[in-house]
């Protein structure tokens, strides 16, 4: 199990990313815009740097819903590989069966 503080940190990151999403997209559009002047781009870069670090979506980590484990995450199910295997062995995942060849 992941520490509760790590799970809470991820929740904060998701909330911050949602809060600053529109502002971040607006600034990035100015930076990558063809019609923007160099001065406007520079101002947008400086404003983007003043936003909280955790408001960037790339700082978020996908975690297992049951344990909070960050590695071995299977996105289709939202579980880590370990919990997915346990659920599959109990028959709780419809259509999923152990590979055999």
UniProtKB/Swiss-Prot annotation:
Taxonomic path: Bacteria, Pseudomonadati, Pseudomonadota, Gammaproteobacteria, Enterobacterales
GO terms for cellular component: cytoplasm; small ribosomal subunit
Function: Binds 16S rRNA, required for the assembly of 30S particles and may also be responsible for determining the conformation of the 16S rRNA at the A site.
Gene name linked to the record: rpsN
Gene3D superfamilies listed in its UniProt record: 1.10.287.1480
The species this protein was found in: Serratia proteamaculans (strain 568)
Key words, A-Z: Ribonucleoprotein, Ribosomal protein, RNA-binding, rRNA-binding
Gene Ontology MF terms in the entry: rRNA binding; structural constituent of ribosome
InterPro entries: Ribosomal_uS14, Ribosomal_uS14_bac/plastid, Ribosomal_uS14_CS
Entry-linked PANTHER family: 30S RIBOSOMAL PROTEIN S14, SMALL RIBOSOMAL SUBUNIT PROTEIN US14M
Assembly notes: Part of the 30S ribosomal subunit. Contacts proteins S3 and S10.
An example Gene Ontology biological process: translation
Family: Belongs to the universal ribosomal protein uS14 family.
Xref: NCBIfam families: PRK08881.1
UniProt protein name: Small ribosomal subunit protein uS14
């Amino acid at each position: 199990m992941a520490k509760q503080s790590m799970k809470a940190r991820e929740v904060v990151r998701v909330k911050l990313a949602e809060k600053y999403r529109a502002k971040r997209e607006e600034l990035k559009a100015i930076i990558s815009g063809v019609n923007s002047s160099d001065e406007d781009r520079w101002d947008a870069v400086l404003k983007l740097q003043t936003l909280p670090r955790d408001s960037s979506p790339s700082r978020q980590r996908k975690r297992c819903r049951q344990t909070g484990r960050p590695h071995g995450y299977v996105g289709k199910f939202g579980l880590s590989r370990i919990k997915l295997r346990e659920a599959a062995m109990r028959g709780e995942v419809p259509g999923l069966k152990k590979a055999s060849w």
